[in-house]
Amino acid sequence: ENYLTILDYKSSAHSFNFSDAYYGLAMQMITYLDVALLNADKLLAGKTLPAGAFYLHVKNPFIKQNSFMTLEDYQKTIITDYKLKGLLLNDTAVLDLIDPAVESGQASEIFTFKKLKAGNLGKNDDLITLDDFNHLIAKNRANMVEAGEKILSGDLKLDPIKERPYTPTVSGPYRAISQFDNTLPENRYRKYIKLSKEDVLSKIKEEIEGHNQESNEEGEEQ
Protein backbone atom coordinates (compact mmCIF):
# COMPACT_ATOMS: atom_id res chain seq x y z
CA GLU A 1 0.00 0.00 0.00
CA ASN A 2 1.05 3.56 -0.74
CA TYR A 3 0.06 6.63 1.25
CA LEU A 4 -0.34 10.01 -0.38
CA THR A 5 -0.42 13.58 0.93
CA ILE A 6 -1.08 16.82 -0.94
CA LEU A 7 -0.32 20.48 -0.27
CA ASP A 8 -2.66 23.33 -1.13
CA TYR A 9 -0.55 26.51 -1.30
CA LYS A 10 -2.31 29.59 0.07
CA SER A 11 -1.48 33.29 0.28
CA SER A 12 -3.11 33.49 3.72
CA ALA A 13 -3.48 31.25 6.77
CA HIS A 14 -6.05 28.47 6.43
CA SER A 15 -7.41 25.59 8.46
CA PHE A 16 -9.92 23.01 7.26
CA ASN A 17 -13.53 24.08 7.85
CA PHE A 18 -15.86 21.08 7.87
CA SER A 19 -18.99 23.22 7.51
CA ASP A 20 -17.58 24.99 4.46
CA ALA A 21 -16.64 21.64 2.93
CA TYR A 22 -20.17 20.34 3.49
CA TYR A 23 -21.82 23.35 1.83
CA GLY A 24 -19.39 23.37 -1.09
CA LEU A 25 -17.56 26.52 -0.02
CA ALA A 26 -14.15 24.88 0.45
CA MET A 27 -13.70 22.46 -2.42
CA GLN A 28 -10.17 23.09 -3.64
CA MET A 29 -8.04 20.99 -1.28
CA ILE A 30 -10.35 17.96 -1.33
CA THR A 31 -10.48 18.17 -5.13
CA TYR A 32 -6.67 18.15 -5.31
CA LEU A 33 -6.60 15.07 -3.09
CA ASP A 34 -9.31 13.35 -5.14
CA VAL A 35 -7.48 13.95 -8.44
CA ALA A 36 -4.15 12.82 -6.98
CA LEU A 37 -5.69 9.57 -5.72
CA LEU A 38 -7.47 8.93 -9.03
CA ASN A 39 -4.19 9.26 -10.93
CA ALA A 40 -1.85 7.66 -8.38
CA ASP A 41 -1.73 4.38 -10.33
CA LYS A 42 0.12 6.19 -13.13
CA LEU A 43 3.04 6.84 -10.77
CA LEU A 44 2.79 4.17 -8.10
CA ALA A 45 2.26 0.42 -8.12
CA GLY A 46 -0.40 -0.97 -5.81
CA LYS A 47 -3.21 0.61 -3.86
CA THR A 48 -2.84 4.26 -2.80
CA LEU A 49 -4.63 5.69 0.23
CA PRO A 50 -4.87 9.24 1.60
CA ALA A 51 -2.57 10.07 4.52
CA GLY A 52 -3.22 13.79 4.62
CA ALA A 53 -4.19 17.02 2.89
CA PHE A 54 -2.70 20.28 4.09
CA TYR A 55 -2.73 24.02 3.58
CA LEU A 56 0.66 25.68 3.29
CA HIS A 57 0.74 29.42 3.87
CA VAL A 58 3.30 30.85 1.45
CA LYS A 59 4.92 33.76 3.24
CA ASN A 60 8.12 35.31 4.50
CA PRO A 61 7.55 35.04 8.26
CA PHE A 62 8.53 37.78 10.65
CA ILE A 63 10.35 36.28 13.62
CA LYS A 64 10.08 38.28 16.83
CA GLN A 65 13.29 37.92 18.82
CA ASN A 66 13.26 38.87 22.49
CA SER A 67 16.66 37.42 23.30
CA PHE A 68 19.66 35.85 21.63
CA MET A 69 18.54 33.10 19.28
CA THR A 70 20.73 30.26 18.11
CA LEU A 71 20.50 28.92 14.57
CA GLU A 72 18.76 25.82 15.90
CA ASP A 73 16.20 27.94 17.77
CA TYR A 74 15.62 30.02 14.66
CA GLN A 75 15.08 26.92 12.51
CA LYS A 76 12.61 25.46 15.02
CA THR A 77 10.69 28.74 15.10
CA ILE A 78 10.47 28.78 11.31
CA ILE A 79 9.25 25.16 11.22
CA THR A 80 6.61 25.89 13.85
CA ASP A 81 5.44 28.95 11.91
CA TYR A 82 5.00 26.78 8.82
CA LYS A 83 3.16 23.97 10.62
CA LEU A 84 0.84 22.22 8.18
CA LYS A 85 -2.87 22.40 8.97
CA GLY A 86 -5.59 20.43 7.25
CA LEU A 87 -6.53 16.76 7.48
CA LEU A 88 -4.54 13.80 8.81
CA LEU A 89 -5.27 10.09 8.73
CA ASN A 90 -5.97 8.93 12.28
CA ASP A 91 -3.53 6.05 12.13
CA THR A 92 -0.44 5.96 14.35
CA ALA A 93 1.48 3.66 11.99
CA VAL A 94 0.95 6.03 9.06
CA LEU A 95 1.83 9.13 11.08
CA ASP A 96 5.04 7.39 12.14
CA LEU A 97 5.92 7.24 8.46
CA ILE A 98 5.26 10.90 7.67
CA ASP A 99 6.95 12.21 10.84
CA PRO A 100 9.16 9.51 12.38
CA ALA A 101 10.78 12.01 14.77
CA VAL A 102 7.71 12.16 17.02
CA GLU A 103 8.00 9.99 20.12
CA SER A 104 5.47 9.18 22.86
CA GLY A 105 4.55 12.29 24.82
CA GLN A 106 5.67 14.62 22.02
CA ALA A 107 3.88 16.82 19.51
CA SER A 108 4.92 16.96 15.87
CA GLU A 109 6.79 20.11 14.86
CA ILE A 110 5.50 19.83 11.30
CA PHE A 111 1.95 18.52 11.64
CA THR A 112 -0.87 19.13 14.10
CA PHE A 113 -0.84 15.82 15.95
CA LYS A 114 0.51 14.74 19.30
CA LYS A 115 1.43 11.31 20.60
CA LEU A 116 0.33 10.66 24.15
CA LYS A 117 2.57 8.74 26.52
CA ALA A 118 0.35 5.68 26.11
CA GLY A 119 1.22 5.73 22.40
CA ASN A 120 -2.21 6.77 21.16
CA LEU A 121 -2.97 10.11 19.53
CA GLY A 122 -4.28 13.20 21.28
CA LYS A 123 -7.70 14.51 20.31
CA ASN A 124 -7.48 16.79 17.31
CA ASP A 125 -10.02 18.00 14.73
CA ASP A 126 -7.45 17.48 11.97
CA LEU A 127 -7.47 13.71 12.57
CA ILE A 128 -10.03 11.70 10.59
CA THR A 129 -10.49 8.07 9.58
CA LEU A 130 -10.06 6.57 6.13
CA ASP A 131 -13.85 6.33 5.80
CA ASP A 132 -14.08 10.03 6.67
CA PHE A 133 -11.61 10.87 3.88
CA ASN A 134 -13.65 8.83 1.39
CA HIS A 135 -16.91 10.41 2.54
CA LEU A 136 -15.53 13.96 2.25
CA ILE A 137 -14.30 13.19 -1.27
CA ALA A 138 -17.70 11.73 -2.22
CA LYS A 139 -19.53 14.78 -0.84
CA ASN A 140 -17.15 17.11 -2.68
CA ARG A 141 -17.86 15.29 -5.94
CA ALA A 142 -21.60 15.50 -5.30
CA ASN A 143 -21.31 19.26 -4.74
CA MET A 144 -19.45 19.66 -8.04
CA VAL A 145 -22.00 17.56 -9.93
CA GLU A 146 -24.87 19.54 -8.42
CA ALA A 147 -23.25 22.85 -9.39
CA GLY A 148 -22.54 21.61 -12.92
CA GLU A 149 -26.08 20.35 -13.43
CA LYS A 150 -27.50 23.69 -12.30
CA ILE A 151 -25.30 25.57 -14.77
CA LEU A 152 -26.21 23.24 -17.66
CA SER A 153 -29.91 23.54 -16.85
CA GLY A 154 -29.69 27.34 -16.96
CA ASP A 155 -29.98 27.84 -13.21
CA LEU A 156 -27.60 30.79 -12.88
CA LYS A 157 -29.28 32.71 -10.08
CA LEU A 158 -27.21 34.39 -7.40
CA ASP A 159 -27.07 32.20 -4.33
CA PRO A 160 -25.04 34.00 -1.64
CA ILE A 161 -24.80 33.13 2.04
CA LYS A 162 -25.99 35.78 4.45
CA GLU A 163 -23.33 34.90 7.01
CA ARG A 164 -20.69 35.79 4.42
CA PRO A 165 -21.21 39.55 4.03
CA TYR A 166 -17.85 39.96 2.30
CA THR A 167 -19.20 38.26 -0.84
CA PRO A 168 -18.44 40.96 -3.47
CA THR A 169 -21.67 40.46 -5.43
CA VAL A 170 -23.78 41.13 -2.34
CA SER A 171 -22.13 43.87 -0.32
CA GLY A 172 -19.02 44.90 -2.21
CA PRO A 173 -18.24 47.13 -5.18
CA TYR A 174 -19.92 44.74 -7.66
CA ARG A 175 -23.36 44.93 -6.09
CA ALA A 176 -24.41 47.54 -8.64
CA ILE A 177 -23.61 44.99 -11.36
CA SER A 178 -25.14 41.92 -9.71
CA GLN A 179 -28.30 43.82 -8.72
CA PHE A 180 -28.81 41.40 -5.83
CA ASP A 181 -31.86 42.48 -3.85
CA ASN A 182 -33.14 40.20 -1.10
CA THR A 183 -36.60 41.79 -1.31
CA LEU A 184 -37.08 40.16 -4.72
CA PRO A 185 -38.43 36.58 -4.76
CA GLU A 186 -35.68 35.42 -7.14
CA ASN A 187 -32.93 36.74 -4.84
CA ARG A 188 -32.62 34.67 -1.71
CA TYR A 189 -29.81 33.88 0.68
CA ARG A 190 -28.66 30.32 1.12
CA LYS A 191 -28.96 28.90 4.61
CA TYR A 192 -25.69 28.27 6.38
CA ILE A 193 -25.93 26.41 9.66
CA LYS A 194 -22.57 26.11 11.40
CA LEU A 195 -21.89 22.42 11.92
CA SER A 196 -19.31 20.67 14.05
CA LYS A 197 -16.85 18.18 12.60
CA GLU A 198 -18.89 15.32 14.07
CA ASP A 199 -22.16 16.69 12.65
CA VAL A 200 -20.69 17.10 9.17
CA LEU A 201 -19.19 13.61 9.05
CA SER A 202 -22.42 12.10 10.40
CA LYS A 203 -24.62 13.95 7.88
CA ILE A 204 -22.40 12.97 4.95
CA LYS A 205 -22.43 9.33 6.05
CA GLU A 206 -26.23 9.37 6.28
CA GLU A 207 -26.53 10.95 2.82
CA ILE A 208 -24.22 8.36 1.26
CA GLU A 209 -26.01 5.46 2.93
CA GLY A 210 -29.38 6.87 1.84
CA HIS A 211 -28.16 7.26 -1.75
CA ASN A 212 -26.78 3.70 -1.78
CA GLN A 213 -30.06 2.34 -0.45
CA GLU A 214 -32.03 4.17 -3.15
CA SER A 215 -29.67 2.83 -5.83
CA ASN A 216 -30.08 -0.73 -4.55
CA GLU A 217 -33.87 -0.42 -4.51
CA GLU A 218 -33.90 0.93 -8.07
CA GLY A 219 -31.67 -1.96 -9.15
CA GLU A 220 -34.03 -4.51 -7.59
CA GLU A 221 -37.05 -2.96 -9.34
CA GLN A 222 -35.33 -3.26 -12.72
Spell out what each predicted region is.
Residues 1-222:
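Structural signature of nuclease core domains in nucleic-acid processing machines
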